[in-house]
């Protein structure tokens, strides 16, 4: 009798999985294009799931936005050099993890990059390279070491007047993680949160196949050189081949090294695979700044983290434990 019952349950589950379909919705959130994909029984159920994700992403945006004057992040920035600001534990922990990533990357990732003076222009209007003195001065207020966290009082304090923090290099990844967690908690068995290229997946397609991500060379975006399965993890690519400037024959990308104030050079694309999109997001930017050799060396020291790097000559580099098909 028990065997018969188990067989019936197994058949029911199998039929239910086969009856599910993939549903997608694309919209603009956090100033970027998001595509939310869920596996659901029908469009009505899918719409409920997608709305859950949208509301969660909007909640995160309100918490971390530096454009919203009423956000806790804006209050932190407004009180830089003045006094500590009480924040929600969620924001406190995000800032704390960001500081830890800064330490891990020797400052190549730094949420206080928002303090940087905007002296570089990548729209084609810049004809003369800024002076070394101006570049050095542009990062005087940048430095994660000047972010003070008090966990007992749940406060954040920026030591320097005029100092700011921003989550541009980690925020979308974090939002994707939180949306994914919420959907899983509400019974969504599989899906993808694509936050403008920051992809976070879980489960499998209704046909039992794994989700796959295509890796392209930005020098030839129509040419896919690798297709990799991603069942329960995140993939983030940093870099934009079109946004760069050239001085004295050297190409500089739009991603600025927060330690020096100089634009990064040598890499045009860095793709990072990690269990969470938050970490993949931050590390992709960090690898871009650190360069091929240092970036690969750092990634190879981290468990469950892999990366693919393309340099400005089109050469492809990969971390030790990733296989490219």
Feature-to-residue mapping (PLM):
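Mature catalytic core of soluble alpha/beta enzymes
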Residues: 4-5, 18-325
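Sec-dependent signal peptide recognition
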Residues: 2-10
